């Protein structure tokens, strides 16, 4: 049975303080328990756009001016095009997997959660190491990139790319150096960092970081076409649902102070948004086209290459 989206109590970390989650209701591996849908879930904060992002009608009403970053320490990451996911553990050691506002059925494959099959298998394979690291203290958020959305990747270092960690004890998001240090001993890849330092004086200097995606090879278009044809899918339709640009989706910008991430913003290419608007369907309604991993990547290995 697919997880019941919206049935769990959602704690939006951007809108309210985090409360201690009553995870003890779940038994070990009992991911089909009805209690699963009654647990409070720590939903990743909504991220505002920087002014100039998207550039669709009405988009600038809630956008933040670049001046808000003036003189502040920022970390700029490539914004990846995947599914927001998270991994944590309950007080009794229960493995908890989530996708945005709902929990996943960790031991059930297929159905509406089919794009997360490999995520569930990967989490189970590394459950011991992740439990020893995260325990019930940390919630690890990441981008799950198995299924193509609008960008196709053919050279990813992993399908799960971590981008934030919430500390339930300190009630804050760790900054980038702490996250990387915490994850140094486990086979978890983090999203690529493009810049860290005081924000550039001009927005155009920030936007100069928007370059070809690090998750693609020079042959990604040919690889994509080969895969679509192997799956016997409609190639012209597949291209209409795919961004042809060589560039990444956009930039993700974090403001980090005193060991924590205190603000976050995003900048998304307007032509990327246009592809979504003109595709005629949502990615969840299409056949899955799996993004490719870099040659030699084994997501189940105990040691992996973390670089991009």
What are these regions (language model features)?
Residues 30-308:
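Core nucleotide-handling region used for phosphoryl-transfer chemistry
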